[in-house]
Every structure is written in C-alpha cells, then in structure tokens.
C-alpha cells in the first residue's frame, strides 16, 4: 500500500527507555544484575488505584484494577532489599546514574533544570510493588539531527525500571524483583518525525548517543522503544515495547494502515446508519448441542454461558482487514481478551465455521432480530467473563462509529499491534514526598560537559586514522559493545594488529556464538589473556578461536590450562621447521611429481597439524623456502 505520509498528516514521537550500567540501583544499594537461579522467597500483593493530587483516578489504572489480579513478587535475600518490597523509604538517588543521565542530556543539546523533582507515576499493572514508578525530570528542549531534518528532544527523565514479568497465570501475575529499580533514562522526542524511515533513523541516532557514553547496558531488554503515532482525523496511539530497531518502520507503517482503514470503516458505518445495540442476549439454548469444541468446553464450566450482542449495520465490516492478517473483529477480540480474560470470540462475518452450523447461525440471527446488514458477536465462557467481554465489545464497537480510539497498544513481532490498555490520562503523576529536591549546580554541569565522550562520527574517523580500520569495520567497532575494550587491548598489545582485535571482537565472537557457545561467559579478562598469549607468541592468531571456545567451556580456567586442554602450546621456529620437514618427507613423491605446485596440498597438511600452534605466515614462509631447496 503506497502511502503519502505528508498527505495523511503523519506525526511520530519516540520514547526511548535505556538501562544504565551502574553499580547500584537508583533508589537503593542493591546490584543491577538479573538472576536465573531459584528465588529465596515470594510475597503476594493486590494493588488498588487511588486519587491523584487533582482528585481524579487515572483511567488506565482503573481498567487494570477491574481485572482483580493478584501479584506475586519473587525476591533474593542477597540482591533485593526492603526498598524493592516497598517496606522501606527510597534511599537518595544514585549519583552515578545522575551523572550518566546528565551526560546524555548534554550530548543531545538539552537544557538541564536547576532543581530536579522526583515524581510518582501511577503504574498498577503490578510491575512495581508500590503501584507507582519514581521518575526525575532532568532536562528539556534539546534536539538531534537526521537526514530528514531536526527532531526535538522534549524531555529526559531518570527513572527506575519495572519488575521483570515471569508468568501470567490468568488470575495472578508473577514478577521478579531483580530488575525493579535499575536506573534508566527515558528520552522523549517531539512529534517532529514525518515518515517511518525518519522514525528508525531518529531511534538509531539516540541509540548511538547512548552507546557513546560507554555507560549503558547492552543486550535484549536493556533498551525499549515506545512510539506515539497519529494521523489527520485519527488518534494518538502509543505503541509499547518495540525492542528491535529494524521493526520501527514496519510498526509505524502498519499503524498508519490500521488508522486509515478504521476511518474507512467509520465512513461506511455512518453511510449505513449503523448502531450498537446495548443489550446482551443469552443464546446458550441455541448452542447447547453445538459441535464447536470451544463452545462445548465453555458450557462444561460452572455457570458456562453463550451470549451475544447485535451490531446493526456492521455486516461484512467485522471481517474487514485493517492490518496485514488482522481485522476489525481482531480488535474486538483483543479488547475482550484483555478486559475479561476470555479466549476469544466468534462473529457472523466468519460463520458458519469452527463447528458452528449454518442452522445455528440462522437461529442466532432470528433470536437477536439481526437483519441482512447486521453482525452478531458471540462469546462462550463463565457467565461473569462473558458479560465483561461483551461489554468491552459494545464499547469498542461504539468507538468504531467515531473512528480511531486513543489506546496504548503492544508491538507484535510481525510489525502489527494489539490492544494493551487505554491511553493514560494526566492524572497519573504526583509528587514524591520521600525524596527532597535535587539541586543541580552549574559547576557540576560544566564538569560533566568538559568530559563528554566522542560522538560516534568523531570516533569513526579516529578509528580509521589511528587503527587503520576500513569503513565497515570502523563503523561496527564504534557501535560495538566492546568499543572500550578494543581500545584497551590496542594500547596494551601494540604488536598485535588492531584489525585482528576488531575482527575478533566483532566477527569471531559472533561466529562461535552461532556454533552454540555461550559467549556471555566471556569476561574482559578472558579476551585480554587471549591477546596477551598471542602477543607473547604462546599461540598463533589461528588459535584465537579455539582459545575463546575453551574459555566459554571452562571460564574458571587460566590461559595455560586452556592451551593444555586444547593442545595449543605454541611451538618454536625450530620445532615448526622440523614438523614441516617431516610432512615434506612423508609426501616426497608428490613434491617430485609437482615441484613447487605441490605447495597447496602441503600447506593444507601443515596447517592441519600446526593450526593454532604456529602463525600461518611463518608456516607459509618456511614451506616455500623448503620447497625451493629441493
């Protein structure tokens, strides 16, 4: 679908959430590590919404509370404390986190506030034990450059990350407290982004600036992108949790398609004088002998019912595609699933099907007085769930008559989105009373400004000049998780070519990961020991791969133990010559027959025996010399 984004009035804003790599959490002194071992215990909580300073209840919080879920929090005795459990007041904010956040703000040309206030942001999905997230507003009015123009940075906040979701059991959600409180920066852009491509470029640029500090966490889940999208006559939609940079373009594009199609459906409904009948019909009797397994299973439940709602003028539109593979009926189903916890719904645009017969559909339509242009939605489950689900469908169908409802949606892996909750209102923020205002002195800002890191484009040019890296490798290295380690290794081992160090960090490690080795077990010391062994001639460069594999398998072993295990003890030049002479002697008939043309065959035999134990260039030089002597 070809879209003129200027014509449709596309506006996009980004919210980037990036974890900071600090020693302690933002409001306590627990370490910022995630654990996969068994927790020491768990507590159970129920959260309820309260009035804001304005005497209002946030609508998103109210929806969450109506679900009536319990929240189970897993904890560890040695890496979580009473602050995470909301049993102790917060400690003063981490100065390390504050410094990093201000560094990021200055790199994005922002104005830092003189006094920073901590606020509470209502969060009642259970991801915070307190029912709110603490956030500190630090800077405003900055900008970044893209190829399509400037993008304003409206705010930068320092805030605590949420607890880590482990499992949703339906009536209860399990969280681990190891992630709760890890410092992160929230960077919000102005709605200056006009195309999907520009959105991706802006997100990439912000990511590059964050990585330039060398003080942010890397890996899955450490950076999350939320995208605010709207078009003319549509509505603002917040898409949560886009983790893959390459997905941003598709998410924006598909959301524009969704809104355009919802507007077309609205226009068609208005032409038909469509109406949502606000009555729920009990149609259990019609489906009591239905062959549909879903309906059979629902009716076996205690108080199991089949009920329906009538949507006048909706026929053919409930089944209309609004995003690739998703229909208006999917929107109804998403809302019912989230609000009531049902498995889904049926609608007459897709029936008879799924074990529901034509005769049953006919009886259904007669019972609710549906005409040819009408659609009927049915849900089967426990009666209380069915009623809540159909109330949600009625609400969503009424919104279809208006156009595009404001929503918070979650990103799906295919670039589509699904309903998550209503868009939060302004009533969700109020002051944090346990933390005094933070005075940010000019001297403190100037000290940080004087020590700002190189921006990626500056480092790129320096890497090409100083380390003789080509454009592709320099670009990879600048954005690499290992960029600081790369420079340290180059300084320590000057007789090792920087190109070899760079290709090892950006190429070799990925190769061995693809082979199934857990490179997360590799620490900086393992790589340093590997290059030290190379520098001292203990191994040849061909042995680097096997050494690193060895450290993945035995991370607690020393370099000498790894060399012993892998059979990679380096050989002297004399020992190499002796082995090559033996190989030539063994294949003398080939040498006599082919002369110097036997080189390729012999080199293969030599490297099979000497790989990792002797430098390939040394083997090559000795072999050629010996062949000439024959």
UniProtKB/Swiss-Prot annotation:
Instruction: Recall the GO molecular function terms of this protein's record.
Output: aminoacyl-tRNA ligase activity; ATP binding; glutaminyl-tRNA synthase (glutamine-hydrolyzing) activity
Any one GO CC term of this protein is: cytoplasm
InterPro entries per UniProt: Asn/Gln-tRNA_amidoTrfase_suB/E, Asn/Gln-tRNA_Trfase_suB/E_cat, Asn/Gln_amidotransferase, Asn/Gln_tRNA_amidoTrase-B-like, GAD-like_sf, GAD_dom, GatB_C_1, GatB_Yqey_C_2
State if RNA-binding is listed as a keyword: no
Where is the signal peptide, in residue numbers? none
For the keyword Ligase, the answer is: yes
Under the heading PROSITE patterns, the entry gives:
GATB
Kindly state which reaction or reactions the protein catalyses.
L-glutamyl-tRNA(Gln) + L-glutamine + ATP + H2O = L-glutaminyl-tRNA(Gln) + L-glutamate + ADP + phosphate + H(+)
SUPFAM superfamilies the record matches: GAD domain-like (SSF55261), GatB/YqeY motif (SSF89095), Glutamine synthetase/guanido kinase (SSF55931)
NCBIfam families from the xrefs? gatE_arch, PRK04028.1
What is the protein's name according to its record? Answer: Glutamyl-tRNA(Gln) amidotransferase subunit E
